């Protein structure tokens, strides 16, 4: 299946180079287009030409690229247009060993398959405590009953710890059971002035320490902590104290947008508004997948099918911009006139 996807990607990118009717094509472009179009026309009985000039010819070439895109992604789009019918035989075209694919396309498909089939440490973009259901007021001292050290969450990446005079205690439990981190990068600081429950202000005196595995850590410096070693705070002073612990970032096995080069840009390209026809076509294609059909996914896609679909559909978007086809999509009423931000914004409503 990797070679099928690589051929589809190669042919679509070659078609995206046909920006002028009289352009001098590179030899490899001529070879790829010649073989691919010959095989495609033979199996589908279409009439795709190597140098599309008329609207009908541009439409035919775009429909060929659309066939290749959905075939390589394993998508059956169904009846989405009165002008287009998906040719299931296209998968046989892409399986033809005579159609060459570029090294670049093969490497990209190999990266998609390789990265989505395994896991690796990745810096996560969201706050460590993002899914916490309740937070406490920052800078306000709070102590639970029968405790001398109380850590609480006060933000998506922030913990504050209240300590009684002379108290010492471990606080690693507040981090555990969340996000399955491999490493957490922390910075701790004294809260110089804080509010007591009665409303009066109090200071944290110098001398408060934070240690990881029994080793004192300097305030204001990034600490690499595995989330398992004892994270202990000691207030040797004779009055209450407060400490702030900030999660600068953490590393876990969760997938991120870095699993594939330029995945962020590919997603933007897929979901960008070009015109109402493309908007309807992209929606119809993605309706047959697990990806959202109009707005980018909240979390990075983490399976091969989704990442491959984004890569192929982004390339099809480039072909659409170059060939400028005109055809109907069921339920879509194109609006004449120049594209404006207001028109694009209204399409997502």
From Swiss-Prot:
Residues modified by glycosylation: 193, 287
Cited InterPro entries: Capsid_hemagglutn, Orbi_VP7_capsid, Orbi_VP7_capsid_C, Orbi_VP7_capsid_N, Virus_capsid_a-hlx_vir
Keyword RNA-binding set for record: no
GO MF annotation list: host cell surface receptor binding; structural molecule activity
Entry-linked SUPFAM superfamilies: A virus capsid protein alpha-helical domain (SSF48345), Viral protein domain (SSF49818)
GO CC entries: viral envelope; viral outer capsid
Pfam families for this protein: Orbi_VP7
Family: Belongs to the orbivirus VP7 family.
Function: The VP7 protein is one of the five proteins (with VP1, VP3, VP4, and VP6) which form the inner capsid of the virus.
Quaternary structure note: Homotrimer that assemble in a complex of 260 capsomers on an inner scaffold composed of VP3.
Name this protein carries in UniProt: Core protein VP7
Origin species: Bluetongue virus 13 (isolate USA)
Source species taxonomy: Viruses, Riboviria, Orthornavirae, Duplornaviricota, Resentoviricetes
């Amino acid at each position: 299946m990797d070679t099928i996807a690589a051929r589809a990607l190669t042919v679509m990118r070659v078609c995206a180079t046909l920006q002028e009717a009289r352009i001098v094509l590179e030899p490899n472009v001529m070879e790829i287009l010649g073989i691919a179009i010959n095989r495609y026309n033979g199996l589908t009985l279409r009439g795709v030409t190597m140098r599309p000039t008329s609207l009908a010819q541009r439409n035919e070439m775009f429909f060929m690229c659309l066939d290749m895109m959905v075939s390589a992604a394993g998508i059956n789009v169904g009846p989405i247009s009165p002008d287009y019918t998906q040719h299931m035989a296209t998968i046989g075209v892409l399986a033809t060993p005579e159609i060459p694919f570029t090294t670049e396309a093969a490497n990209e498909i190999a990266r998609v398959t390789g990265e989505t089939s395994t896991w690796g440490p990745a810096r996560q973009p969201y706050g460590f405590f993002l899914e916490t259901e309740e937070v406490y007021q920052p800078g306000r001292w709070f102590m639970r009953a029968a405790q001398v050290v109380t850590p609480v969450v006060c933000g998506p990446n922030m913990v504050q710890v209240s300590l009684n005079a002379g108290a010492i205690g471990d606080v690693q439990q507040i981090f555990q059971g969340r996000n399955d981190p491999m490493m957490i990068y922390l910075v701790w600081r004294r809260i110089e002035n804080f509010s007591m429950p009665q409303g009066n202000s109090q200071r944290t005196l110098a001398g408060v320490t934070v240690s990881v595995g029994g080793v004192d850590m300097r305030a204001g410096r990034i600490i690499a902590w595995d989330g398992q070693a004892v994270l202990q705070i000691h207030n040797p002073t004779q009055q209450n104290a407060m400490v702030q612990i900030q999660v600068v970032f953490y590393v876990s096995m969760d997938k991120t947008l870095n699993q594939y080069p330029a995945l962020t840009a590919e997603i933007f390209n897929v979901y960008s508004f070009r015109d109402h026809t493309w908007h309807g076509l992209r929606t119809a294609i993605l309706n047959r997948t697990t990806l959202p059909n109009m707005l980018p996914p909240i979390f990075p896609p983490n399976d091969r099918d989704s990442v491959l679909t984004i890569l192929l559909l982004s390339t099809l978007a480039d072909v659409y911009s170059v060939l400028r086809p005109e055809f109907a999509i069921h339920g879509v009423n194109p609006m004449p006139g120049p594209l404006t931000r207001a028109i694009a914004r209204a399409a997502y409503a």
